[in-house]
Amino acid sequence: MAATAVVAPQAEASESWYLALLGFAEHFRTSSPPKIRLCVHCLQAVFQFKPSQRIEARTHLQLGSVLYHHTKNSELARQHLEKAWLISQQIPQFEDVKFEAASLLSELYCQENSVDAAKPLLRKAIQISQQTPYWHCRLLFQLAQLHTLEKDLVSACDLLGVGAEYARVVGSEYTRALFLLSKGMLLLMERKLQEVHPLLTLCGQIVENWQGNPIQKESLRVFFLVLQVTHYLDAGQVKSVKPCLKQLQQCIQTISTLHDDEILPSNPADLFHWLPKEHMCVLVYLVTVMHSMQAGYLEKAQKYTDKALMQLEKLKMLDSSPILSSFQVILLEHIIMCRLVTGHKATALQEISQVCQLCQQSPRLFSNHAAQLHTLLGLYCISVNCMDNAEAQFTTALRLTTHQELWTFIVTNLASVYIREGNRHQELYSLLERINPDHNFPVSSHCLRAAAFYIRGLFSFFQGRYNEAKRFLRETLKMSNAEDLNRLTACSLVLLGHIFYVLGNHRESNNMVVPAMQLASKIPDMSVQLWSSALLRDLNKACGNNIDAHEAAQMHQNFSQQLLQDHIEACSLPEHNLITWTDGSPPVQFQAQNGPTTSLASLL
């Protein structure tokens, strides 16, 4: 049975009544629009003829499949699939019906939140499918995915390891690579980096040595390179990742030129593919956006986000795959951060609202992205100077996340809130101790460690401990220059410039502020441009350069006006009320604001 098509295999096609009923059922199923009720009637009529066990089992499977895919009657679908699974186990040489029924039934159990019923069913199917390579591999993948959704990554990794060894034994290096790459992905999620490195090395060798269908080979390479790129990005190594990212972009270009011929490998265990070509294309756009965001190439991030979102809109018209919504949410999360940096808060807020709406449609999506949503709202609150709300959002996000990198990112931003408030020393010292870049830093991310040095420098600056601040900021500069972290470089330079200005070293201050301004313009980072232009104005005034001082003052005025206008627009949006949401599902309706209710002092 292909998907939900109602067909009769050769062995069961001898009865003319059976063929006639199947023909009618398939006609009704494929009508435009489909006439599912009539299709179901035709299939149910098969039982009136007291059919053989084979026909009975297959008809139960077909009914279960049609009801599962085309109706909301999951109870009746479950009854038919359970009968198909029960009867087919008593019939020899009936693997396609037996394992299709097991696979579909466990999927239905999961949809009904009966995971405890799905697991033993899949385990039994795996146990009795060892002589059927395609189904054995497919069922192993399915059970591994179920464990992954339950966050039981250890069990999922074990199953993928079993699958890889089985694929090797049955001579399928292609599917062995798929199992190993999937395991590598989970090990990366678990941060088991000691196990990831040898596994990725082995995968690289298998992928390069495998000679088979060009699209399958290139899709393996895309999977392999995506893991490598995300591994580097997780580690905050924006410069080191460039060769891998370039290879990945070339690889997706190669795939897009290959013809999508039907892949019919001689080994049934090879009948898998990782992702459709179009999904891979969006994924490559996505990792490119992630790289551009971290590196501070925000216009490039915007360009690739637009391309990816356009592609996603087209795909979602034809494909309801949940992975597309995940891609869309991750893209929006990154572009929202870009907007906040480039001074487009109102647009960022509307996109946060869009993420809320996407999460409303899927409890799993919301569960996976709730912490990120509150983090984004916290960043938005900082940008509009609502520090109490920012603290509440970050505290909520910390409660919801188990992801170490995200936890560290949130704590770093929460520390910046406490520094700005100036009266939260006890909480601040506690936070800074937990993200001490000199001692037991919680994650291996180069970028986050550099940011932790910056936060220390900022705190020392506010306390008037300028030499200590300079030490921390020089450490940030050294780390950010090593990996092309442009935003951190710009922030560190302007803060160092400010310190030298306060100390009366105008020449050294100028040496810091001018490159900070140039870099901030290139990113573009509006808050650093605002800060730099104010410093340049004061520096030039102190040095008696009145023309340059006037020019810098004009720049500062322009940036202030732009930010002020955007600030007023954002705070006037009904979505601004999202800043008070800290519990449960995101609100759908927003009350319009009468006008901005937040202080503008931080902008001027």
Swiss-Prot record:
Coiled coil: none annotated. Disulfide bonds: none annotated. One of its GO terms (cellular component) is chromatin. Disruption phenotype: Early embryos exhibit numerous developmental defects including shortening of the A-P axis, ventralization, and defects in neural, somite, head, eye, and tail development. TPR repeats lie at residues 99-132, 371-404, 450-483, 490-523. Its main location: nucleus. Pfam families: Cohesin_load. Keywords: Cell cycle, Cell division, Chromosome partition, Mitosis, Nucleus, Repeat, TPR repeat. SUPFAM superfamilies: TPR-like (SSF48452). It is found in: Nucleus, Nucleoplasm. Gene3D superfamilies: Tetratricopeptide repeat domain (1.25.40.10). One of its GO terms (biological process) is maintenance of mitotic sister chromatid cohesion. Belongs to the SCC4/mau-2 family. Plays an important role in the loading of the cohesin complex on to DNA. Plays a role in sister chromatid cohesion and normal progression through prometaphase. This is MAU2 chromatid cohesion factor homolog. It comes from Xenopus tropicalis.
